[in-house]
C-alpha cells in the first residue's frame, strides 16, 4: 500500500478532523490530555507540537502564560488560526523557536507518525528551558488498543484517504526510553485509554459514565497506566 507524505495526509484529513471530536470518546481523550498538560503548564510558556486545528491548544491557552502551536499541515492550521491561536507551519524535526524559549513542549497523537522520532524529541528538548518539561505521547505496542487496531479495517479520514495511508509506529516503554535524548529524564507516565475496548462504549448510558470514571482513575495508577493505548512520557529537561 502506498503511503502519503505527512503533509499531504493531514491536509486531506483537515476537512474531516473535527467531524467526530464532539463524541464522548474523543472528549475523554482530550480531557485526559489537557488535564495532564495543566499540571505542568499553568502560568508557563507552552508549545504544542502538532497542534492540528487547535482543539487542545485553545484549551491550553486558557491556563498557560503564552501558548504557541506548530503543525506541518496548512489545512489544519487554517482552522487553528480561525480560533485566534498563535500558530506556525513547521516540521517537528525543525522547530522555528529559539533554544530554551519555552517551559513546556507537548505532543499528542503526532510523534507516532514521525519516522525521525529521535530528531523530533531532540528538537522538543532543545526549545525547553532547563527544569522544564517535554510531554510526549506514543502509541503503546502492548495495549488492547493495538490489538483491536490490528484486527479492524482501516478508518477513513476523508473521502479518498484512510489511516493506513500514513506512517504509524507502535512502541513499548523500552523503545521510548531509547529515543529520549540524554538531557531528558522520564519522570512520570500517564496511560490513556486503559480499558476502553471500542469508542462506542462511551456512548452507552451508565456504562459510558462508568468507563470514563475508571479511565480517569487508572490513568496514573502504576501497573494499570502501562496498559494504556496511549503512553505519555513526562520528561524533565536537565
PLM regions: where:
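A conserved beta-strand element that flanks and buttresses the S-adenosyl-L-methionine
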Residues: 106
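Class I SAM-dependent methyltransferase SAM/SAH-binding core
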Residues: 53-94
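A C-terminal cap/extension of S-adenosyl-L-methionine-dependent methyltransferases
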Residues: 155-156, 178, 188-238
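Conserved class I S-adenosyl-L-methionine
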Residues: 1-41, 44-52, 55, 59, 133-158, 200, ...
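A short glycine-rich, Lys/Arg-flanked "PGG" loop and its adjoining helix->strand segment in the class I
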Residues: 118-130
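Acceptor-substrate binding/catalytic loop of class I
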Residues: 155-175
